[in-house]
Structures are given as C-alpha cells and as structure tokens.
Amino acid sequence: MDLQHIKAVYFIGAGGIGMSALARYFLHMGRVVAGYDKTPTPLTRELVQEGIPIHYDEDVEAIPEACKDVQSCLVIYTPAVPETHKELAFFRQRGFEIQKRAQVLGTLTRSHKGLCVAGTHGKTSTSTMCAHIMHESHIDCNAFLGGISKNYGTNYILSSHSDYVVIEADEYDRSFHWLRPWMTVITATDPDHLDIYGTKEAYLESFRHYTTLIQPGGALIIHTDLEMKANIGANVRTFTYSRDAGDFYAENIKIADGEISFDFVSPLENVPEVVLGQPVPINIENGVAAMAMAQLNGCTADELRAGMKTYLGVERRFDFQIRNNRHVLLSDYAHHPQEILQSAKSIRELYRDRKITAIFQPHLYTRTRDFYADFARALSLLDEVILCDIYPAREQPIHGVTSRLIYDQLAPGVKKELIHKEDVPDWVRNHDSDVLIILGAGDLNDYVPQIKAILETK
C-alpha cells in the first residue's frame, strides 16, 4: 500500500513508544488515526489530547468507521500483540493491509535517506542526539525515536523539506531487517532477546545481515569493540568509532564541576571544545557516534558543537530529577547487563566520593534467567542495591527465576535488600539516600514522582 494514498491508519498497541511516534506522524500528515492499547498511560492520554481516539478493550465495535474501509485503511500492530487479539483477527479476516511498525519505517527508508542507529544499548540516546543535531542544522531531518526527547517533548520530529529520516533500529523480532539504511551506526551487539534468537551466534548473525541492507553510496559507522563481523555491499564505506579510538573518537576529555567537554577527532574535520548539554560520561561515546553520522551528512563544525551543547537528553535515559548537594535522583531505562554497567560506570565517574544506591526492577524472566550473574557484576560497582520483583511484560513466570538470583550473586561488600515495588516509596522515606538511581524498563518508573517528592522534603 502506498503511504501517500491511505486515508486512515489504525494502531493495535498505539501506546508503545515507537508506535506512538508513527501515530503522531500520520496525524500530522492529515490521516484519520485511531487505535487500541491494553492500558491507559500518560502517553496514550497525550495521544487522545492530540486528537487520536484510543480505547482499551478488545472491541471491534469501538473501531471508527473510517478505519473499517479495506481499500483506504492501513493497520499497524506491535509484535507483542497475540494473533488471537480480536481486533487483529477482524482485520486479517477482511483482508486489510496489516504491517508491523518496522515495515512502515522500512517504507520510509526507501523514500528518504534513512539514518539508522542499531545496537543492544545506546541507540535511543545516540539517535535522539543525532536527530537534534540534524534538526538544528541547515540540513534538518525527520525522526522516529525510541524515547521522549527532552528538547522537543515528543518522540518524533517532522520536517517539511528534509530528505533525511533518523530512525532507532530495533533488533527485537529482527524488526530492523525491514529497514534500508542510507547510513547506520551500530553501538553494541551484546546478546539480548535470547527468547527470540536462541543463541548468541544467531543474535550476531542478525546484525551481520542488517549490515547487508545498507544502500550503495551509504556508510556503516561501527563501534571498535564489536564481535560482529559486518558484511557490507559494494560502494558502502565503513568507519569505526569509540570513546578513545577509531576513525572518530574523543580526546582531551574534561570532567569537572558538573560539566563535560572534549575534542572531537574526525577524518573529515576535527571539532575542538565540544560541550555536552547533558553532562553524562556515556554520552561522550554516544556523542562521537551521533556527530560522526551528522558530519558525514553535511553538518558543519559549528552546527555539531551547537547541537551537542543544547542537547538535553531523553526521558528515562540518565534522567536527572534532583541534582543538589543533599540529594541526587535520576531514573534510567537500563535493563540489559551492559546498559547497567555503563550507567554504573557513568554515575561512579560523576560521583566518585558519594554513596550510590540503585533500586532495580529486572525486566523479563528470560533475560533474568540468562544474565543474572552479569546483572550482579554490573550492580556490584555500586554501594547499595535494592531489588524489586521481576517485571514480566509479555512473559509468564519461569520456575525458580526471581530477583533473588541477582541478589545472591552480588559482591560481598554491597549492601542489598529485596523489596516489593509498592514498598519503594516507604523504603526511600525511611532510609538515607545520597545518590539514588532508579533502574529498569518496567513500571518502577511510575514511582519516580513520588520518590522525588519524598526526597525534596528530607
């Protein structure tokens, strides 16, 4: 189906971070947009306020009439929705055009120059940073992001004239195989989603296949430390990057008084005195990748420097809520061992002499089963670890798999505790916290406003 000729778009799973970006895009393109989601959330309420009706029961009668025309309505669904879903079955039985979110993004990468960011971790921050640099430059861009940009208060950017589209490329369910990138960054390939891939080798092969999809004339920008071996086509350039080595890297790094600056080293043009608007150590490396992609597509040194300085970050990605001499509170979406490790290293680098406490809600039983020892090693960099029950998301419980697996593997010197998430506010109220980080991709983040209010009165 030609996206230019559809009149209505119906979303099954409209409240997902990636799905909602597409919903907003089609609304701005003048299409009738509606959808279903399992539960109301702040994001679904925002969509409703913006003019997108959403309901929360599997009810065919609730589907607007404009979305029941098989000739003019496109149905987009998330892989998390089961085939038994009543509304999905309704559309399938009647022969509607039904696509996954990634298929629609793939179509956009055929009509635009797709600047994609893939990787186990770092892709949301890197893609949002790149989109901000590009959008503020003379080039501009469209963007579909995996988080809410704090610069724009939304998860997408729409341009009236740019041929570029920045996309966070999701490896879950091999979704990124639908894309045809003009250029792509690959930040990391630490195995994840083994419930889908089965083995580390299959996971790495999926990324290898992704590199075959880069368009001729484009480029691969790949982290120096990856096990995965790329398989690029003819006329595709390859560049490497990291914090301190590769074709693109940072030098003269300065971390002091809550500020971070560095010199950007590039085969195109070095850019001295880059200041991070969100001063987090991990954003040095993310920033190098974002600047590399933006520079390769025409951004000037001044535009790179200005974009980095004004970048405010992404909600739930090293997201500071309180930052003063008495308390530091931040939330972070980290839910893979390597993400936890990067967050722990960054916060330790920023607050070397302060007590750091993490409250962590593991995400998925399979991920906890596969990586509990790795989680424990990463969390053991901190002084105190409070573990909540596993957030199941799409999964059923697995016998013997609980947060205690991580708890039992924590280093001897780490103070530790197991609590229910509902008890977190009381725990914060009754304990002294110096630097407190809320970790995980589940619903523990819903308690952050309450935790913030408690700490502000202490």
Where are these regions (language model features)?
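Conserved hydrophobic helix-helix packing surfaces used for dimerization/oligomerization
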Residues: 8-9, 75, 115, 141, ...
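Short internal beta-strands
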Residues: 31-38, 220-224, 357-360, 382-392
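Beta-strand->loop->alpha-helix junctions that form or flank phosphate-binding loops
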Residues: 36-37, 55-60, 99-103, 144-146, ...
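Short acidic/histidine-rich motifs immediately flanking catalytic phosphotransfer sites
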Residues: 68-74, 162-163, 432-434
